[in-house]
């Protein structure tokens, strides 16, 4: 099942534009730069493009850490990105294994977990988190945090669901107090990773 959200759609940016935006990001104080594509995962075409973009940004000597976020990926594809200069790969588990079929039917939770394992095998640093407030239970939240910790990620994005009228989840099911409690819980359950709080 796919939903049509009111978002801007565009094709891949040019390598020149990507380098220009990375340069501006560094000038604004950024220490990392993310190369993101939409879709299920990496294809040969996308892998080649992200690799070319990574090489170009690294060649600009900006001192930026490069993070790729391109969906499911094989070890071979990830090794190609690493060789091109990508430092981290971001692939979130989103929620618990049990609750996952409620929010996504295009691919399985196990595929997401396997991609995270592939990231580690390829020698990239893993960025892996999830989203809170989609109707999951506290048990689901704990299960997801346990799964994330088992992957020993470098960074953990903690997303809090932002409703979109195109989606069947009509409101955030988490209170501000619960959100703060979950941040505390994540710090305890995933002690060795850097936690990042963002919208989702």
Residue ranges and their predicted role:
Residues 46, 79, 102, 138-140, ...:
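Short, well-ordered secondary-structure micro-motifs
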Residues 2-21, 25-119, 125-132, 154-159:
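Core AdoMet radical
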Residues 35-37, 110-168, 178-199:
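Conserved C-terminal portion of the radical SAM core fold
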Residues 8-11, 172, 176:
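Hydrophobic alpha-helical scaffolding
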């Amino acid at each position: 099942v796919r939903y049509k959200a009111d978002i801007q759609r565009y094709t891949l940016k040019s390598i020149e534009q990507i380098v220009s935006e990375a340069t501006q990001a560094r000038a604004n104080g950024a220490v990392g730069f993310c190369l993101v594509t939409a879709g299920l995962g990496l294809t040969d075409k996308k892998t080649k493009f992200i690799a070319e973009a990574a090489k170009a940004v690294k060649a600009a000597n900006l001192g930026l850490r490069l993070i790729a976020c391109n969906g499911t990926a094989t070890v071979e594809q990830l090794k190609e990105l690493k060789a091109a200069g990508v430092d981290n790969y971001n692939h979130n588990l989103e929620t618990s294994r049990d609750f996952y079929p409620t929010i996504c039917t295009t691919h399985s939770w196990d595929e997401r977990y396997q991609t995270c394992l592939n990231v580690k095998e390829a020698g990239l640093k893993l960025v892996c988190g999830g989203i809170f407030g989609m109707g999951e239970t506290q048990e689901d939240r704990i299960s997801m945090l346990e799964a994330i910790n088992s992957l020993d990620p470098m960074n953990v994005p903690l997303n809090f669901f932002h409703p979109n009228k195109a989606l069947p989840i009509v409101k955030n099911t988490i209170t501000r107090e619960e959100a703060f409690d979950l941040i505390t819980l994540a710090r305890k359950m995933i002690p060795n990773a850097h936690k990042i709080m963002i919208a989702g």
